[in-house]
Amino acid sequence: MNKEVIPVTEIPKFQSRAEEFFPIQWYKEMLNNSPVYFHEETNTWNVFQYEHVKQVLSNYDFFSSDGQRTTIFVGDNSKKKSTSPITNLTNLDPPDHRKARSLLAAAFTPRSLKNWEPRIKQIAADLVEAIQKNSTINIVDDLSSPFPSLVIADLFGVPVKDRYQFKKWVDILFQPYDQERLEEIEQEKQRAGAEYFQYLYPIVIEKRSNLSDDIISDLIQAEVDGETFTDEEIVHATMLLLGAGVETTSHAIANMFYSFLYDDKSLYSELRNNRELAPKAVEEMLRYRFHISRRDRTVKQDNELLGVKLKKGDVVIAWMSACNMDETMFENPFSVDIHRPTNKKHLTFGNGPHFCLGAPLARLEMKIILEAFLEAFSHIEPFEDFELEPHLTASATGQSLTYLPMTVYR
């Protein structure tokens, strides 16, 4: 299906990159004054409160993932038709979605995560060890960018030498559509998609004869009701997993350290002295400092579930990052508090049938890299002359850090 891309950046109309990076004032405004908002220019309904967002994401009888318009794409917006449930996974509703999702979930079982943990810890330890003591580093280049790429290359079972090529493909495949560069971006995505396919397809074929402990081997062996993946479907499946395995995690790690430096400077010291709190810190960072996250749904039948008259075919955008600031769910939501008991109820990874498959891996990676950093460095300090605005760039998840300097002390 060739979908129309909704120019979602036209809805908030941010005045700067920094404002888009952390639009806390806009969240407040929409939550308090326009919780259900119709945006005429994009012809979309927008919801921001926790219960509304949860309803739109989970109630597939009324809000469908399949529609002619969308806010986000994985890969390219090609006109080539595909009947593969994996290729179309993000557009499927239950029950069609369930079988494809179950096959894909074979890559993220609790057993797999437990088996992967030592490998991920070793990658984290190697990166942290390479950082010189009492030095100023760029956390993006030195840690948050290479770490997830190294991990996913290892978990896919591909040569480590290709890890940076993975990151390049991810940057292109998940870049946002720009109304002024639609055709150019489309061509870039199609080229990157073709390169990725040509690279990974032979690896999948080879692994069918040489199974090992990696995600591709798990996908080869996955079976639900007698159905298995084709080689082509496995390549497409790995492309979906790249979003959470590299793109999302890389930005989340950088944002976590930004928060330690600029939101609450006492937090790093607290975590250093109480390292068992690392999982709580990860959840609060996912709630408070994640990028703008949203999902679109198409109304399947007329309803008034959101307190307004919705017509079949209407598009509703659920703003998860805004609902994470809803004070009916999170006390004092506009402040960092790793001890808030409801933090894990955030909807950063979605809700319902399309809850992010890679969420457990993203959480595990963030926890491991934070624990490794806390073990190695006694404290961190911000770079005195750092300016945020010049060091942000547009990404699939909003504005992302390209440079974050800090001084580290062992």
UniProtKB/Swiss-Prot annotation:
Enzyme Commission code: 1.14.14.-
Key words, A-Z: Cytoplasm, Heme, Iron, Metal-binding, Monooxygenase, Oxidoreductase
Binding annotation for heme: 356
Annotated InterPro entries: Cyt_P450, Cyt_P450_B, Cyt_P450_CS, Cyt_P450_sf
Subcellular location: Cytoplasm
TM helices/strands, residue ranges: none
Gene Ontology CC terms, in alphabetical order: cytoplasm
PROSITE patterns the UniProt entry points to: CYTOCHROME_P450
Pfam families: p450
Named cofactor requirement(s): heme
EC primary class: oxidoreductase
GO molecular function, one term: monooxygenase activity
Alphabetized CDD domains for the sequence: P450_EryK-like
Keyword Transferase: no
Biological function: Cytochromes P450 are a group of heme-thiolate monooxygenases. They oxidize a variety of structurally unrelated compounds, including steroids, fatty acids, and xenobiotics.
Family affiliation: Belongs to the cytochrome P450 family.
PANTHER family in the record: CYTOCHROME P450 YJIB-RELATED, P450, PUTATIVE (EUROFUNG)-RELATED
Protein name (database record): Cytochrome P450(BM-1)
Natural source organism: Priestia megaterium (strain ATCC 14581 / DSM 32 / CCUG 1817 / JCM 2506 / NBRC 15308 / NCIMB 9376 / NCTC 10342 / NRRL B-14308 / VKM B-512 / Ford 19) (Bacillus megaterium)
Gene: cyp106
